[in-house]
């Protein structure tokens, strides 16, 4: 079936809650593995609340990584993205972001935004590689240990498939 470009179907919205809860558990586990060093984790309950929101979509590479994002007219935001450490630097994140570009183009989205911890060098490298640029900093935004905070780097990118 063909859909208007700005009304792509959210097939997972048709899933029942049991399936979505299972998916939320999977995403939460991947998130924990990816961010264990930073002591950051999105709970399964929080991820489930995202997945049932009609404004939220995701891209999933089974057992390897995912990206949860929102689209609001011509702008999109990556809410979180995680790749299992053993698959980092193996192209999974690159594939996810390329697929995200395709989805955003079909949705007539012009820009995508994200924030990333300043000490997450692997993610910073990946985002810059696919065309994201820094446009600001949130000082001491992420609390990674009991008494340690790191800045959030704000990044944006013009959506296109040309790298």
Residue ranges of each PLM-predicted region?
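Acyl-donor (CoA/ACP) binding surface of acyl/acetyltransferases
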Residues: 139, 150-152, 158-162
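Residue-level recognition of the GNAT/N-acetyltransferase active site
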Residues: 84, 115-119
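Conserved catalytic-core motifs of GNAT/GCN5-like acyltransferases
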Residues: 113-115, 128, 133-150
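Short hydrophobic/aromatic beta-strand or adjacent loop that forms the aromatic wall/cage
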Residues: 55-57, 149-154
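Conserved GNAT acetyl-CoA-binding A-motif
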Residues: 104-115
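Short glycine/proline-centered loop/turn elements that form peptide/ligand docking sites
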Residues: 93, 97, 120-123, 140-146
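Acetyl-CoA-dependent GNAT
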Residues: 1-4, 8-14, 22-88, 94-99, ...
């Amino acid at each position: 079936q063909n859909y208007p470009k700005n009304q792509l179907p959210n097939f997972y919205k048709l899933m029942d809650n049991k399936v979505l809860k299972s998916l939320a558990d999977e995403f939460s586990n991947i998130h924990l593995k990816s961010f264990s060093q930073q002591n950051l984790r999105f709970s399964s309950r929080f991820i489930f609340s995202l997945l049932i929101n009609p404004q939220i979509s995701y891209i999933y590479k089974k057992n390897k990584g995912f990206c949860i994002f929102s689209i609001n007219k011509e702008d999109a935001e990556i809410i979180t993205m995680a790749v299992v450490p053993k698959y980092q630097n193996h192209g999974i994140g690159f594939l996810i972001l390329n697929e995200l570009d395709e989805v955003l183009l079909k949705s007539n989205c012009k820009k995508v935004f994200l924030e990333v911890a300043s000490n997450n060098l692997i993610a910073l490298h990946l985002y810059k590689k696919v065309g994201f640029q820094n446009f600001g900093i949130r000082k001491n935004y992420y609390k990674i240990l009991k008494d340690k905070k790191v800045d959030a780097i704000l990044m944006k990118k013009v959506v296109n498939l040309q790298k």
